[in-house]
Amino acid sequence: MSKPNNQNQQNNQEQIPEDANELIAQLQAKLEDIVASGKQPYPNTFKRTDYAQDLQTAFEGISKQEIADNDAKGEKTQVNVAGRVMLNRGAFIVIQDMTGRIQLYVARKELDEETLADIKSLDLGDIVGVSGYIGRSGKGDLYVHIEEMQLLTKALRPMPNKFHGLADVEARYRNRHLDLMTNETTRDTFMVRSQVISGIRKFMLNERFMEVETPMMHPIPGGAVARPFVTHHNALDMPLYLRIAPELYLKRLVVGGFEKVFEINRSFRNEGVSTRHNPEFTMIEFYQAYADYHDLMDLTERLFNELATDILGTTEITYQEEDISLKAPFERLSMSNAIAKYAENFDMARINDRDYLAEYASTTLKQQVKDVFGVGKLQTIIFEETAEHQLRQPTFITEYPAETSPLARRSDDNPEITDRFELFVGGRELANGFSELNDPADQAERFLGQVAEKDAGDDEAMHFDAEYIEALSYGLPPTAGEGIGIDRLVMLLTDSASIRDVILFPHMRRKLEG
């Protein structure tokens, strides 16, 4: 990611009237003057040929004298740039485009009165197109020597600055357009997000996975343990659920013969909002026939290594002042061993004693325990409360209980646990994968167990999906599947504290009037 430079840190010192409405009125009056003069305030005829950062890169290391020598030989570098006015200091104007910033030089003796008047009337936030040639200032800053300038869009509201900026973090989320306009860190974050998604797609395609699309509205919610959003299809007169995961549809594609598939898309869960959770989130899910969960752990290590190297240039990163290494191999630790390592005063000899687990969870950890909770559910609660937040370096937790893994294949060594893993980094889950359960009878039994939990009051338990059981009956080859939370991965790679920092338009509470 690019680092802010001195030019980017400068703020316009123009005095802004205390009454914002007064300034808005002034901007509106300028627009009316433009219209009255017969000019088009919103033309669409300027053709940009050059970008700010491309020019900065192309002329890096070329001195002011070298540029001047080329000019003297009639070899001026003609450019056409466009962007938003971020700073106006008379002789120099700074504009910003999608790649960065560049200065414009106003040579007053070389410009006609009309152009000078147009330049003088510019306000911060106006969008201009400029034709000219490259130069370099005495301070070493690259600039475009203005020959022609055209106002492309007149701003009718004042831009935030250090005196009248976005008041708080919530204001940034609600006004992302202003946040992007004025905050370089925010722009960098979402550039990295774009690179992460395109990098994942490139990696999967190189691994011979096929990208697919599956329904966003499901007749039965499934594929994960979560509470769904409910809607209604008027024409079909039936309830539908925004998907909580695409898993069951993707595995039906593997049944159909697409042996390596992936989907990058959003899922929806009608649950709480926090620094780690947003009701609408982006994930990649992928499935590979003739593979097991060990293969996917290996693939995940390669993916994370490649993304960090390609985007950041290193696998050694810092997240919230903590050094983290994304270099393979990652630690692999069973859930029971994680409990043994991190749960204080826990008697491992009683790891399968339900009464002891319930007492530890309720008394020591102050967790609500229901009668329907079995040994596996209680083990998972204890792991989540004692170990999860302490998994700072990349760690695969394996051997999840079958009770809390209704879609995962049972272990050949112990039918009470599954061939499943979750990847934790910085104390947060980033990925969940397992060897898929492809026994239709076992899957039906697991669904019935989930239905029993739902009947007992667990809103997040799964429904019984008869169509999926029927698909399994045709034969799902040995398969492994995984889901990776892209939002949390971007948080990690951009050192962002909150998931809202990496979602362009996060869900917010309704803003109260007045």
Swiss-Prot record:
Binds 3 Mg(2+) ions per subunit. One of its GO terms (molecular function) is magnesium ion binding. GO terms for biological process: lysyl-tRNA aminoacylation. Mg(2+) 1 binds at E422, E429. GO terms for cellular component: cytosol. It is an enzyme of class 6 (ligase). Keywords: Aminoacyl-tRNA synthetase, ATP-binding, Cytoplasm, Ligase, Magnesium, Metal-binding, Nucleotide-binding, Protein biosynthesis. Belongs to the class-II aminoacyl-tRNA synthetase family. This is Lysine--tRNA ligase.
